[in-house]
Amino acid sequence: MMSFNLILILIIFLILIQNYVIDGNDNFNLIKCPDEIPNLKKWSNYKSWKKLKLPIKGESINITTPILMDIKPPDLDVIRIFDKGMLVWKHINNLELRVKAILIYDGGQLIIGSEQCKFKYKATITLIGDSIYTEINQTINGNEYGQKVIGIDNGGTIELHSEVTKTTWTKLISTISPSTFNSNKNILTLLDNVNDWPIGSEILITSTDYDMEQSETNFIVKCSTCKTNQIKLKNPIKYLHWGSITKGVDERAEVALLTRNIKIQGQVGKTCVNNKLVCDFFPFDSFGAHIMIRKGFVNAHFFGIELFNVGQSHVVSRYPIHFHLCDRVDELGGYENPAYIKHCSVHKSFSRCYVVHSTDGLLIHDNIGFDSIGHCYMLCDGIEMDNVFSHNLGAVTRYGLLFPHDRSCDMCSRIQPNDFNGNPTQCTECNAVSTFWISNPWNTLIDNVASGSDSTGIWYLFSDYPSGLSHERGIKYNIKPYLIPVKKFYNNNVHSCTNGIQIDGGVKLTPPSKTQPQQLNSMINARYKPRSNPKNPNSKPSPSIFNGATIYKNKWRGCWARGGFLFMKNFKIADNAIGFTFASEGTIPGDQNVGQYIYKSLIVGESDNIGQQSNNIPIVNGRTNPYGENGLMPIRGFEIYDGTISLDSMVFSEFKSLPPLFRNSSAIGFLRFNDWQSSSETTIKNIKYINVDKEIHFEQSLMDGDKISTLRDLDGSTTKLSNSILVRNLLFYSTNNCYYKKPWDALICKEDTRQIYICNDDTNSTNYLSLSSSVVAIRDNIENQKIEQIGLPNHSPRNRFQFLVFKNHHYDFHFPNHPTPPILRVQPMNWKQSEKFTFGICIGISKGINLKVLKTVNGTYGNSNFVEELYPTFSMNLISESTYYFNEITSMLYIMYYQYNSKDHLNYCPEYGCEELVIKISGKNSGRVTGDCQSLAYGSSFTLFDEVVNRKFENSFQMDKSIIHNSEYAYRGNAYLPYHPTSKSQIQFKCNHCIPSVGIKYFEIWVNGNRNSNQRISIQLFYSINSNQLKSQPFAIDKNYFKKNSWVLVRILFENLKNLLPENHIHLISSFDGLSIINSLELNQPSLFLDNIKFIYDN
């Protein structure tokens, strides 16, 4: 049996071993500190060197044995550490190594301190070199490392461990201002204990306003009266820095310690030594140092390192700390002690801060990146996964030159002025530089801060496959970032950027071409569709959860999130032009059966942090305001767009319209100038408003998407009417179940909203009479209850028209600018099983056409397995889901839609596809007549000519030739009028006070160009005052697209004709004596034909 004493000795021995291990260096695991390793040869001893003399200035040396750095050597060329070579720093103060490059590989090690023995003195490595033109590009085993580099290749080890303070960065707890903070009162009070922050250290105080340049540095001086959470500054401050939680949002400035014991820096000159393009944008020396680690390294740990004057603005892969193509660097990659970057500080970087390139499992914790060019914390290609970014601070991220997504718009147009097709490069291809660039969602972001970026704080992007050097590997292993859920996003903070958080877009993976002319690596549209199996787009959707974010003082938008199954919770947002916007698709969400949710969040319009004017950010209404429109751009807390969206358990606070400008400020609004769809299923509930003047705001803009803006208030917490819907204040929506809410300029209705798309499936055969297209919808056969849509901008000419409609109402659709398309598809959205509605389509002509109506699924009218043909009936009352009715008098086609299949609540269509109706129009008269039946279907009219001249005008009717009778050519019947526009010719319809001056809405005339031409004709009204016969000024018909064999409707507001009378005559006229049709030009014009001339009464 082993004696007790022997057991005790073994225990003590094991404890000693634990205390003497050096990371990854099994040969010396009984040594407490690296500089105590046996057999270390002192640099200062000439016997340590093969040449038996110390290295001299400008010499390159190979280190193949353990060397102890115990003196400051002269400036050296290249140090190669390999075989069993080690370069270990002696634990003494102020050692500096100045060298052009350090290359570590094949068993080589660079060691300053260890995990058990942090380096507590000042140590500096300065990488020297004058310019890109004079320095040699270094290589290891054929791998390029560039210039001014510490390179770690296969078999290499780098261990840099500095003694650090308890707190790397913290926050202010009281506001400081230049007016009250000076050399006599220059103490910062901070959130955490900072009594170990060294005197003389440099600190950063971040901006708490819209201008990131309000971030500023200072130095700590001795303070005998400071508490443990206070420091005294050397210099006065320049800007106001907020130091409290305001209205529930933490807007306190971050205060960070930039100085570390171990410093790696680049030697830089006073001027730019580079090509003209680089120097134009960066008129200073941007040729900094960099560290690159490649696959196969033994160990790589960076703990408490300061990196200054690092990165190279002109070359890819020359970044301060760069894990390059390393694969896994954690336990799964075979590392007992996984790689990490902790408590480091990068400042004054000419290219990025911390870069993870085709590397998985890296820990980046409690670091600082300040004043950097290009993305700061970066996942390069979109193949990087399982990396952890925790408690990092990034501040002042500037535009860079390397890739389009780094560049400003100006940089983009300078570097690549035109795309593949010769068109100017679009700014949207660029302008995406971000403090955190997250190109693959399967990574962790916890407790990070992005404080200031020229563009964006945190950007999640979703390319189809990884880009760059990882592209082929990504395809091989079927890695699709756009299908990958977010691994973890928790409690991140973004402020003082242009945009806070961006969740959208991707990088172009292919070279430019005719069909995709954008440059390689430019920003493109992409759709995020997270899946339970990210390798299979057909697997079930999987939610991506963003839990906790503080977002404030961003010039434009707090957060923009486009994608499928997105959950946002515990957000706190304040002082942004737009707090939060969800987006999905402009037509139908690409990710069906899912929605977007935000809940348990706070959005504040304007906090107590009023800011300080600087850098073209003016003071408006007593506070900084960067938003534009002379300070009047509306504030929107939550901006509704696309959908389907759900807001639940939200608090909106401090949305006030204050004097003297009374700027529009609303808790909830809609995307302005919107061309795209809005889901009829978007809902809000459990909403609380605190100090809010306007809960909802509808903009004045009336683009297609603006007109269909809507949401449903499920519980009445906003409208005081549960299960009500909000829509724009338009007659089209105003039913007996609606009431007007004046402060919102909105209608609140007890109606059920649905959507209908009218789609032109044959634009090639459509007889477009101009470049414009539109569809008019009319509700319940009342002509003034109409809305006109010009179509979604995803096709030219526009071919898809969206309408928001109410269940249990009737809708007709007309085509006022051209004949009804020969193939028309009606696509109902968000209808439920067994629901039905009847609608009308204007065909425009009743003779010489053939109609065919089909019920299809997803437009598959060419596939008989999914087609059901409808058949005509002879009465409106006999319409069913299997029949249609065509009214030959009005040329209106009436069809019933019946939804056979059920749909999930969030799906726009049933699971088996959208049930649609397809109308096919053929025959010799197809495409001959404008598809506008409004006058025939709803209006009462005063006709001047239709087959015959109205008897009121028979005695005075004048024209140069007689009426033509030709049923094959006439608009509707058998007769029409010819007109030969010469300098003196005209057609007159004269009567005696037969046309009332009130009660008429339109003048209409149908025109056939006889041949394709640009004929110009005008209309004049006759009237009399005191027996004097007078004429109005001519009203020129501005339609210049009359075509041969096409009848075009010209509809003129009667008010526009009357307004051409002399102003002093208008109020004297109670009736008119007729009108004339005249030539608008002095020269003779080709003949044209006229038909169905009438006035339409205002019903």
From Swiss-Prot:
Q: Which UniProt keywords apply?
A: Glycoprotein, Glycosidase, Hydrolase, Signal
The protein's name in its UniProt record: Protein DDB_G0287365
One Pfam family in the UniProt entry: CEMIP_beta-hel
G8 domain: from which residue to which, for each copy?
47-174
| PANTHER family for this protein | PROTEIN DDB_G0287365 (PTHR15535:SF29), TRANSMEMBRANE PROTEIN 2-RELATED (PTHR15535)
Q: Does this entry carry the keyword Lyase? A: no
Q: Which family does it belong to?
A: Belongs to the CEMIP family.
- Enumerate the glycosylated residues: N62, N137, N664, N764, N858
